[in-house]
Swiss-Prot record:
Binding-site list for ATP: 256-258, 343-346
Record-given protein name: Serine--tRNA ligase
Species the sequence originates in: Pelagibacter ubique (strain HTCC1062)
Job description of the protein: Catalyzes the attachment of serine to tRNA(Ser). Is also able to aminoacylate tRNA(Sec) with serine, to form the misacylated tRNA L-seryl-tRNA(Sec), which will be further converted into selenocysteinyl-tRNA(Sec).
Recorded name of the encoding gene: serS
Domain of life: Bacteria
Family from the record: Belongs to the class-II aminoacyl-tRNA synthetase family. Type-1 seryl-tRNA synthetase subfamily.
Listed InterPro entries: aa-tRNA-synt_IIb (IPR002314), aa-tRNA-synth_II (IPR006195), aa-tRNA-synth_II/BPL/LPL (IPR045864), Ser-tRNA-ligase_type_1 (IPR002317), Ser-tRNA-synth_1_N (IPR015866), SerRS_1_N_sf (IPR042103), SerRS_core (IPR033729), tRNA-bd_arm (IPR010978)
Main location: cytoplasm
Reaction catalysis annotation: tRNA(Ser) + L-serine + ATP = L-seryl-tRNA(Ser) + AMP + diphosphate + H(+); tRNA(Sec) + L-serine + ATP = L-seryl-tRNA(Sec) + AMP + diphosphate + H(+)
Enzyme class: ligase
Subunit structure: Homodimer. The tRNA molecule binds across the dimer.
Gene Ontology, cellular component aspect: cytoplasm
C-alpha cells in the first residue's frame, strides 16, 4: 500500500518509480480522488462544527436547521466513503516502489547475477531428470496423484518421503539453532484481511485456493506461503522496539493455483499446486531492511552450502520483482537434466509496504509511531531441494547418494535404491 501524502508531495518521483515497474497507472485520477476525498472531509468537518455550535445555542428556531445539517453530513459521509473506497482500491492494486539500487529491466532477462557457488557435477553419463529418477525408484507417483486429486500433484513414497521430511527438519534446525529464528507452527488458513495485509489480495485473487465455509461470511484461503500468516502476526500492533528484530521460521504446505503458469513445468515437482516450503520472516526497524535482506539471503544459501549443492545468487530487476517487494534476491540451484539454474529461494525486502496495509508499527528513538519493515524468504522450497538432490546426487545405476548433512536425519543410510 502506498502513502497518498508521499504521492501528493512528489508526483513526478512516484511516476518515475512506476515507470521502472513498467506498469501504467492513471496517477492523475489518484490525485483527483484524493482531492475529492479531502474536500468531502473538510465539508463534513465544517458542517459538524456548525451543528456543534447550534447545539450550544438556546434558540429553538435553529432546531430545524440542525436536522438539515445532519442529513447533509450523512450524504457527504456516503459520498466521501465511496471516493475513499475507490481511491484505496486503486492504491491497493499498485505494486511496491523499487529500491533505487535495483537494476531496471522489464523481465528476467535483465536480472543480474551476483555470485556463483559450489561445483557443478561432471557426470560420465547423461543425467536423468528428477521425475525419471523418482519414478524408476518407485518413489514418485504422478499418475496416482492425477487419479486421486488432479494434475500438478504427486505421491512421494518410502525413502524419498523420508528424505523430504529430513530436508524440512534439517532446514528448521539450521535456521533455529544457527541462524537465530523462532520456530512457529502456524494455521494454514488465512482470512481475506490477512491475505490483503501481505499483498496477495486483491491483485492475485485468481491464484488462491478459496475455501467455501458455511459457518462464516468471511472469505478464507489456504495459504500460498507461510509468509502470509507469519507476517500478519504483527498486524494492528505497536511493537516494543526492544523486540525488534523479530525473526520467525515455519515449515508448511503451500497451496497455489499457478494460474499464470499454463504449459510451464507440466512434468515433475518444480511447479505444483501443493508443496512444502520452509519460510523465513523478519520484522525490523524500517532503516534496517537492506542489511536484514543480506542476512536472510545468507541464511538461505547456508542450507545449500551444507548440502553441497551448486547455486547462484541473482538480484531481480524492477520488472521481475514480486508485487510487495522493494528488492529481491533469488537463489537458483543447478539442475543437471535441464543444464541450467532454477529458482529455489526468493528473499525480499518489502520496506513499509506490507506494514502500511497491516498497520504494523513501532516507537522509534524519538517516540514517534512509525511503520515497521517486513522481509520474507524461502529457506528453502523443500520440494525443489529434493529435486536438486535427486539430480545432483544421482548415480549411473539410478540410485541417489544421501548428502552428508542429511545422514543423521536418514538413519545414516548412504544411498537410496530402488524398491
Amino acid at each position: 500500500m502506498h502513502n497518498i501524502k508521499k504521492i501528493r508531495n512528489d508526483v513526478e518521483a512516484f511516476k518515475k518509480a512506476l515507470n521502472k515497474r513498467f506498469i501504467e497507472i492513471d496517477v492523475d485520477k489518484i490525485l483527483s480522488l484524493d482531492e475529492n476525498n479531502r474536500d468531502y472531509i473538510q465539508q463534513r468537518e465544517l458542517l459538524e462544527k456548525e451543528k456543534k455550535d447550534i447545539s450550544k445555542s438556546k434558540d429553538q428556531s435553529l432546531f430545524e436547521k440542525s436536522k438539515k445539517i445532519t442529513v447533509e453530513i450523512d450524504n457527504i459521509s456516503k459520498l466521501q466513503a465511496g471516493v475513499k473506497n475507490e481511491l484505496e482500491t486503486i492504491l491497493s492494486s499498485i505494486p511496491n516502489i523499487p529500491h533505487p539500487d535495483v537494476p531496471t529491466g522489464k523481465d528476467e532477462n535483465s536480472n543480474v547475477e551476483i555470485s556463483k557457488s559450489g561445483t557443478i557435477p561432471n557426470f560420465k553419463f547423461k543425467p536423468k531428470s528428477h521425475y525419471e529418477l523418482g519414478e524408476n525408484l518407485n518413489m514418485l507417483d504422478f499418475d496416482l496423484a492425477t487419479k486421486t486429486t488432479g494434475s500438478r500433484f504427486v505421491f512421494v513414497k518410502d525413502k524419498l518421503a523420508m528424505l523430504e521430511r529430513a530436508l524440512s527438519n534439517f532446514m528448521l534446525d539450521t535456521h533455529v539453532n544457527t541462524n537465530g529464528y523462532e520456530e512457529i507452527s502456524p494455521p494454514l488458513i488465512a482470512t481475506d484481511a490477512t491475505m490483503y495485509g501481505t499483498g496477495q489480495l486483491p491483485k492475485f485473487d485468481n491464484d488462491q485456493f478459496e475455501l467455501k465455509l458455511d459457518d462464516s461470511s468471511d472469505r478464507k484461503f489456504l495459504i500460498p506461503t507461510a509468509e502470509v500468516i507469519l507476517t500478519n502476526i504483527v498486524k494492528d500492533q505497536i511493537i516494543d522496539k526492544k523486540k525488534l528484530p523479530m525473526r520467525m521460521v515455519a515449515s508448511t504446505p503451500c497451496f497455489r493455483k499457478e494460474a499464470g503458469s499454463y504449459g510451464k513445468d507440466t512434468k515433475g515437482m518444480i511447479r505444483q499446486h501443493q508443496f512444502y516450503k520452509v519460510e523465513m520472516v523478519s520484522i525490523v526497524e524500517i532503516d534496517k531492511c537492506l542489511p536484514e535482506l543480506d542476512r536472510m539471503t545468507d541464511c538461505a544459501t547456508k542450507i545449500l552450502d551444507l548440502l553441497k549443492l551448486p547455486y547462484r545468487k541473482i538480484v531481480l530487476c524492477t520488472g521481475d520483482m514480486g508485487f510487495s517487494a522493494e528488492k529481491t534476491f533469488d537463489i537458483e540451484v543447478w539442475l543437471p537434466s535441464e543444464d541450467k539454474y532454477r529458482e529455489i529461494s526468493s528473499c525480499s525486502s518489502c520496506g513499509s509496504f506490507q506494514a502500511r496495509r497491516m498497520k504494523a508499527r513501532y516507537k522509534n528513538e524519538k517516540k514517534e509511531t512509525v511503520l515497521v519493515g517486513t522481509l520474507n524468504g524461502s529457506g528453502l522450497a523443500v520440494g525443489r531441494t529434493l529435486v536438486a538432490i535427486l539430480e545432483n546426487y544421482q548415480q549411473e545405476d539410478g540410485s541417489i547418494l544421501v548428502p552428508e548433512a542429511l545422514k543423521p536425519y536418514m538413519n545414516n543410510i548412504e544411498k537410496i535404491v530402488k524398491i
